[in-house]
Amino acid sequence: LNIKCQLENLLSDQQDKTAISLNETYKRCKQWTDKTLEDIENLLTFSVDAYGLKACIQPTDIRELLTQITTEYRQNNSIGKQIDIQTEISPTVPLAQVDPLLLYSALGNLLGNAIKYSGTKVRIRIGCRREAKKWILTVQDDGYGIPPEEQKFIFQEYKRGQRYKGDKQRKGFGLGLCYVAAVVKAHHGHIQVNSDGKQGTEFIIEIPQRKAKRRKARS
């Protein structure tokens, strides 16, 4: 509501449009946005802890889902980095039985981390293929990497990399990967991370293939 009020003030004819006034309004909007995101993270943490995540499985076009994610991050580059996102999707990928909303948010989280934990330039590759009876999704970047000693607990709550603790520019690392792991678990899948700790990180998600549920014939 506070953000809405500030934005309405910006659009109002009576609003002072001087540079100083606009700057103060933008600062208030950012403060309330940060507070809202913090509240959402706390709510997500409570929900995951108390209830877990339940996937709403439905036929999903993985190619379209990945296209939507990459397009969103290419267009909404508010931090001014040079971002190169490439996709490697098998041309014969059929519909997958997954929860599109949960999977979208999980992959978006990994993509956001790849951008956040990198220098001024970052190259990201997102892959998708079907192998045997499972889906394999990968998110690979050439960012800072994750030290081997930290990789074993990064999917636990609030376990944020030591090198980024106290860094206000890189919030949310602790809950984000915990949430991603919860999404994968809700799909009865598995997630792993590969990194030499110096440069680059790859997350590999494996989700078992499900058969589409047949509708019961009406009697």
Regions found by a protein language model. Give the residues of each.
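Short helix-loop "hinge" at the ATP-lid/N-box region of the Bergerat-fold HATPase_c
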Residues: A114-I115
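Short alpha-helical segment of the dimerization/phosphotransfer core of two-component systems
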Residues: R28-T36
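Conserved micro-motifs of the catalytic ATP-binding
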Residues: Y51-C56, L95-V98
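Short conserved segment of the HATPase_c
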Residues: I146-Y158
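Short beta-strand/loop element within the Bergerat-fold HATPase_c
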Residues: K121-K133
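Conserved catalytic submotifs in the C-terminal HATPase_c
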Residues: Q58, Q82-P94
